[in-house]
Amino acid sequence: MRGGTANCCVVISEEEIICPIVLEPTELIAMNLPSLLKFEPTVVKGGTIFVNSSIITEKVTRDDVRAIYVPCLDIANELGNAKVANMVMLGAYIEAMGNLGVETIKEMLVHMFTGPKAKLVDLNIEALRRGAACVK
């Protein structure tokens, strides 16, 4: 949605997920200021907030969460495609949280991008790598 917030809750678990509704997330990825302002208060104490610092100049106001600032759009533009800003953030998330494997994501990309779109695999992998480097 342009000019507002859009959100999606993702539950990662090795056990059966009974209810996918998340009222108090352990992590938040804020790609724009309205999303940060709306969802920052919902993150649990001790949680992690990832901020797209290319667009959001404000800092996380809470001191009971970990804040990670990633210049997603700047990096994506350096790579020549603003559409991979989300992959830059995913790379930072994977590096910081350690609950997903980069190899798993790479396998998914190879599976998803076939035929003429196969050329996008390397771009997306580089975006992941650059995002991860922001956290190291």
Place the predicted regions along the sequence by residue.
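Active-site cofactor/cluster-binding pocket
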Residues: M1-K136
